């Protein structure tokens, strides 16, 4: 017998705010979403700050959003967890950090600190780097090198120069640390197997190859003069003595796993074959668990498991489920949605659609949405699934480019696809829910008219198609209990979210 699915459609980066010249959501032609808002019960959800386990006022992001949606509860995030440890002093007692630094003292080797030099709080926080520098000073380490990955997505595209200058000043004040390399996250934090990019980052940090400039602040300024903003800054070597070599220690201070895996694997995995390089031993600390299969690493902050999240609970109830997304958001509907669990649960199928191989997604704002849509509808029509979790990446990934017209096209693409998926779900007698994990495309311009590439703290929509006449406002943690509610299932006690349906 064919199943009538409950389909959750996550429009990544689709927030709500007043219409305006930089609002790609309101500027776009969205006949499908307009119709859904007119015909079905809808409400708004909080997707930032304390409501998703982040510090008050901190913008949400895809990892946090999917973890909260899948968990059915507010999941306390790594950013405040690590920041709180700095405040209470337990940070400096961390076993992995101490092992890395003690190995340097024992072997007379160098300590390398690398990660995203930003206060965006999505992948990292610069204050965590500063705490590591303070710890290195307290231990009396002599050779400490910072490899700075510039952001330009979760913060202003030209904020990197200021962060580099601040980092230099912090090193001077502490009397420890030198910036060895500077580069855009485009190279060091790829997540789409673009090994030619990762290799340029690797070659700069390990071999000292790349543009040479002893002044890291000037290196960033030169990049701006060439009209290359932070995210895309080519790797620059500032101190050729600061290359990574045998028996050195490395602490990767990013706490978000998805963009930390590739460069980490290139260094720690003897079986790595993304590009030619020689393996050598290091003491390597991942700030959080980037990948359970990663060899030769220590984990500073092991993940606190999310027990009885939606995926695990549906599986235990004998239900079937599908997770589908293109490459850029595949980890979010699987690993993050499952609370940091890589393995598939019994009854859980996964479909990965490759993201297009373009330099930046403003060049192809439709990305792979139409193929994701087609494959999802095939699976809906198969009648094989009780629950389908689907992500459209466009509004977020194109929003990050800062190109307004491309973001408008991205919203219009998602609108078309959402309409088709909802229609297919309802035709099968199912229920469709349309929501987002955080805002982005609804604010594409800064107040001064310059591009806005970061996420927002705006509310996100929630539309319930095929069930329920009245909904209350809520937060992302309320989505899983709502899914269980429309399926006639009681939520497990671990879920503290509440159904959005007003009884």
Region spans (language model):
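Feature captures the catalytic ectodomains and active-site-proximal regions of enzymes
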Residues: 1-503
């Amino acid at each position: 017998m064919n199943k009538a699915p409950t389909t959750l459609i996550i429009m990544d980066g689709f927030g709500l705010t007043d219409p305006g010249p930089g609002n790609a959501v309101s500027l776009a032609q969205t006949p499908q979403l307009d119709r859904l808002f007119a015909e079905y019960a809808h409400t708004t959800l909080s997707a930032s700050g304390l409501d998703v386990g982040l510090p008050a006022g901190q913008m949400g992001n895809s990892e946090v959003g999917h973890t909260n949606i899948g968990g059915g509860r507010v999941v306390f995030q790594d950013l405040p967890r690590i920041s709180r440890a700095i405040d209470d002093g337990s940070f400096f007692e961390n076993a992995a950090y101490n092992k890395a630094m003690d190995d340097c003292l024992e072997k007379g080797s160098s300590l390398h600190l690398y990660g995203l030099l930003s206060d965006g709080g999505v992948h990292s926080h610069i204050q965590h780097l500063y705490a590591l520098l303070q710890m290195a000073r307290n231990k009396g380490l002599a050779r400490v090198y910072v490899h700075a990955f510039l952001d330009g997505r979760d913060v202003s595209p030209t904020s990197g120069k200021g962060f580099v200058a601040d980092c230099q000043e912090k090193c001077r004040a502490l009397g420890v640390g030198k910036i060895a390399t500077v580069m855009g996250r485009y190279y060091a934090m790829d997540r789409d197997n673009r090994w030619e990019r990762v290799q340029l980052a690797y070659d700069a940090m390990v071999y000292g190859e790349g543009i040479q400039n002893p002044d890291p602040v000037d290196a960033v300024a030169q990049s701006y003069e060439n009209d290359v903003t932070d995210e895309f800054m080519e790797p620059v070597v500032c101190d050729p003595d600061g290359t990574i070599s045998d028996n050195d220690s490395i602490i990767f201070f990013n706490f978000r796993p998805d963009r930390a895996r590739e460069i980490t694997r290139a260094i720690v995995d003897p079986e790595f074959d993304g590009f030619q390089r020689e393996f050598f031993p290091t003491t390597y600390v991942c700030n959080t668990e980037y990948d359970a299969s990663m060899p030769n690493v220590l984990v500073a902050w092991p993940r606190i498991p999310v027990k009885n999240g939606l995926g695990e609970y549906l599986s235990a109830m004998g239900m079937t489920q599908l997770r589908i997304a293109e490459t850029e958001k595949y980890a979010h509907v699987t690993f993050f949605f499952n609370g940091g669990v890589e393995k598939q649960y019994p009854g859980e199928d996964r479909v990965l659609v490759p993201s297009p191989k373009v330099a930046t997604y403003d060049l192809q704002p439709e990305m792979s949405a139409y193929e994701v849509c087609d494959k999802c509808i095939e699976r809906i029509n198969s009648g094989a699934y009780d629950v389908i979790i689907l992500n459209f990446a466009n509004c977020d990934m194109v929003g990050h480019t800062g190109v307004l017209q491309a973001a408008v096209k991205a919203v219009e693409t998602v609108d078309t696809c959402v309409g088709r998926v909802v229609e297919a779900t309802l035709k099968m007698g199912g229920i469709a829910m349309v929501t987002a994990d955080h805002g982005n495309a609804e604010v594409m311009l800064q107040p001064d008219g310059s591009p806005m590439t970061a996420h927002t703290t705006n509310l996100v929509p929630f539309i319930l198609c095929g069930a329920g006449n009245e909904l209350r406002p809520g937060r992302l943690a309320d989505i899983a209990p709502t899914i269980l509610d429309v399926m006639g299932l009681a939520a497990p006690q671990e879920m503290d979210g509440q159904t959005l349906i007003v009884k």
